[in-house]
Amino acid sequence: MARGKFITFEGIDGAGKTTHLQWFCDRLQERLGPTGRHVVVTREPGGTQLGETLREILLNQPMDLETEALLMFAGRREHLALVIEPALARGDWVVSDRFTDATFAYQGGGRGLPRDKLEALERWVQGGFQPDLTVLFDVQPQVASARRGAVRMPDKFESESDAFFARTRAEYLRRAHEAPHRFAIVDSSESIPQIRRQLEGVLAAL
């Protein structure tokens, strides 16, 4: 069986990507069913036992900026080795709620960590590995902030300012502009039915 495909969902907190992730994966599995392939759904930080432990630390504990980035990439290395690469080698498709673009957007754009440091970590951990497709849920920070307002106990990222998320969004859009062949941008300011129509277009193009 041919190697599988790797799809990532990205966007600032409150963009709505997680709301649509399982719906997208269910539709993708329907398309892949006759081929015998499976859809593996995962997330970052997380995806492995170590990754989920790191997730709790990363989302809730204050820390030095470079420590934060190093922990993100440590979890990613484990995620690649134990989940993503084995699934792709089996011919399965993997859909991840966040991957490396999030680190460039949050730790780079949002927190200001120099891009060259992140690029060095990316080369070390991933080599040339990149997603086959990244679905970017794009929304104005003010809209995302209103959505996040419904979260009872926000983590340290969800608690960031609109200015932080404006920088994060700008970095996402910069990366999408630099790799248009890899990105599909979804206008997530629209209603759920409208967003799902956009996602149907993404699925049809696979």
UniProtKB/Swiss-Prot annotation:
SUPFAM superfamilies: P-loop containing nucleoside triphosphate hydrolases (SSF52540)
One GO BP: dTTP biosynthetic process
Protein name in the entry: Thymidylate kinase
CDD domains, sorted: TMPK (cd01672)
EC nos: 2.7.4.9
Function: Phosphorylation of dTMP to form dTDP in both de novo and salvage pathways of dTTP synthesis.
Catalytic activity: dTMP + ATP = dTDP + ADP
UniProt GO molecular function: ATP binding; dTMP kinase activity
Keywords in alphabetical order: ATP-binding, Kinase, Nucleotide biosynthesis, Nucleotide-binding, Transferase
The protein's enzyme class: transferase
Positions annotated to bind ATP: G11, I12, D13, G14, A15, G16, K17, T18
